[in-house]
Structure formats: C-alpha cells, structure tokens
Amino acid sequence: MNTRKLIVTTLLAAMSCTPVLAQNDKAEPYFTPEEMPNMLKTPLTPPDSLSAAFSYDLSRFLWGKSVRATERGEMAKADAEYGLQVVCREFAEPFGMEISKEKTPEIYRLLLDALPTCDEISWNPKNHFMRRRPFMVFHEPSLKPEDDAPLSKNGSFPSGHTILGWSAALLLSEINPDRAEAIVNRGYLYGESRVIVGAHWQSDVNAGYLYASVAYAKLHTSDRFLKQMEKARKEFKKLSGKK
C-alpha cells in the first residue's frame, strides 16, 4: 500500500469509527483508484528547478511567508486540517447552510463518498514524482511544524488539500449554484493556504485545482453518484425553501 493510500485509508477508518457516526457512515468511493483518470499520461508535471515556472513557485513561497503573521496566515493555519469535518465547517458559511450528518444527511453522504473518490486521482502522481515540499527544500519548519514529519513522506505534487477543497467547492456549487461564487472562492483560498503554510509549491496547488476538476467530471459518469447528487439537491431545496 503506498503512502498516500495509507494516509487516506487511515483517515476514512477514523471517520467511520467516530462515535457520532453510524456504521453506514463509512465512505464508499464511487470508483477505485484504477478506474480514475491516469494523470501520469498527461503533460502536467512539477516544473524544472531552472524554469520560469519554478521561479514563480519561489516568489509565491516568499509571498506566503510574508502573510503568515496576518489574518490570512491564521486562516491558512486552520486550513491545514484535512478531512470531511473541515469541509463541513469551512464551507457552511459560503454554502449558506450548516452541513452535517444530522442536519443535511444526503449532502453529507454525497461528500463522504465523493471527496475520497476525487482524492484517489492524486495517488499515483504523488508517489511517482515524490516532489520535495518547500519546508524540506529550505530546511525550515512550515507554519504547522507538527505536520512536517508525516508530510515529508508524501509527495508534494499535486496538493491533496487543494483537491479536497476544490472538489468540495465544485460539489457544493452544483447543489447550490446561487452561491457558487462564494463557494468557489473558499475552495480557492483553501488551496492557496497550502502555499502560505509552506507545505506546497504554487504549481502543486494549481495542479490540485486541475486534478480535482478532472475527478469531478469522472464522478458524473457514475449512476450512483448522479442519484445521490439528485438526493442532495432535493434536500437542499427543501431545507432552503427554494423551488
């Protein structure tokens, strides 16, 4: 089992064992990793260290460090948390509704199954490239030093946090398109936070947005996903009073 798969499997196991959740709250991805698009067959790769793209990575890293002591830095530090619970917490305001198993069970179910599915698209590239993270290259702690040791064993390209946040933004925008601008903005910032923390390069984050979009498109080829999305949309309309 590769490192990325081990991390995600552990996360899902923890989610399924949380007391507040029932037994049927274990994630059931819509596709296996082998069924997801193989992004290694695309030209998208980490930039060469002598390229203009990497120069941009460096400039964005320095920008990120410059805002760590600001309110934006505090947001980035909070965004270092990973998983369904942070999605429910951080996207509730832009989505316009509390997201939880109790209040929105169909939306929650959709996210529980869809987000791990989208993450699968990153496993092979992360292990193939094993790109070193900024805090490793510069031999200095990130904004979340307690995360550095486990992250150092996991490739930087693409950003898994960005895939999580952008996938969530796309899914929630489909459920509530009237709030799409606010939802997508939060998804973008969640990815950008990884640059500020120093856990990812900007090119990792940019790749994460693209990977998530490809995974999101793949979801729509699953009949089970489409049925659950319809349930989620109906639930939202009922709770929000929209027709």
What are these language model-derived features?
Residues M1-Q23:
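Bacterial Sec-dependent N-terminal signal peptides
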Residues T3-R4, G160, S203:
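Residue-level micro-sites within transmembrane alpha helices that shape
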Residues A14-M15, L171, V214:
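Alpha-helical transmembrane segments and their juxtamembrane interfaces
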Residues C17-T18, E174, A217:
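Residues in and immediately flanking transmembrane alpha helices
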Residues N24-V197, T221, Q228, L239-S240:
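Hydrophobic alpha-helical bundle signature of multipass membrane enzymes
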Residues L189-H220, R224:
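Interfacial helix-loop-helix junctions of multi-pass membrane proteins
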Residues A215-K243:
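C-terminal membrane module of polytopic membrane proteins
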